[in-house]
UniProtKB/Swiss-Prot annotation:
Chain's gene name: rpsM
Family as reported in the entry's similarity comment: Belongs to the universal ribosomal protein uS13 family.
Protein name, per record: Small ribosomal subunit protein uS13
Region (Disordered): 94-118
GO biological process: translation
Keyword Transferase: no
UniProt source species: Shewanella woodyi (strain ATCC 51908 / MS32)
Description of how the protein assembles with itself and partners: Part of the 30S ribosomal subunit. Forms a loose heterodimer with protein S19. Forms two bridges to the 50S subunit in the 70S ribosome.
Length: 118
């Protein structure tokens, strides 16, 4: 297994699909990385040479991925909550942020129903 950005990449998958296993890299960015490093998208990871894997590592290192990206996202959410803006308040209350209805739906965000006290 090749190790890129601290993640073990599966050998049996195609390069584009294997790169999407890294948090912060989707299909589009994986294709762009393959094009920039001139690695075939349909080549499997086990077929790549060590030099090609090194170029993939360097290309992925240019992006914010994995732990740094997770930390950045959580800090952005924390900043919104500290500001006390509408989105921050919705995060704090675990409600939908983008105008969805909450009278009947939003069970995923709100959690399980609480029993009604009589």
């Amino acid at each position: 297994m090749a190790r890129i950005a601290g993640i073990n990449i599966p050998d049996h998958k195609h390069t584009v699909i294997a790169l999407t296993g890294i948090f912060g890299i989707g299909r589009t960015r994986a294709r762009a990385i393959c094009a920039a490093t001139s690695v075939a998208e349909d080549a499997k990871i086990k077929e790549l040479s060590e030099a090609q894997i090194d170029t993939l590592r360097e290309a992925v290192a240019e992006y914010t991925v994995e732990g740094d990206l997770r930390r950045e996202v959580s800090m952005n959410i924390k900043r919104l909550m500290d500001l006390g803006c509408y989105r921050g308040i919705r995060h704090r209350r675990s409600l939908p942020l983008r105008g969805q209805r909450t009278k009947t739906n939003a069970r995923t965000r709100k959690g399980p129903r609480k029993p009604i006290r009589k």
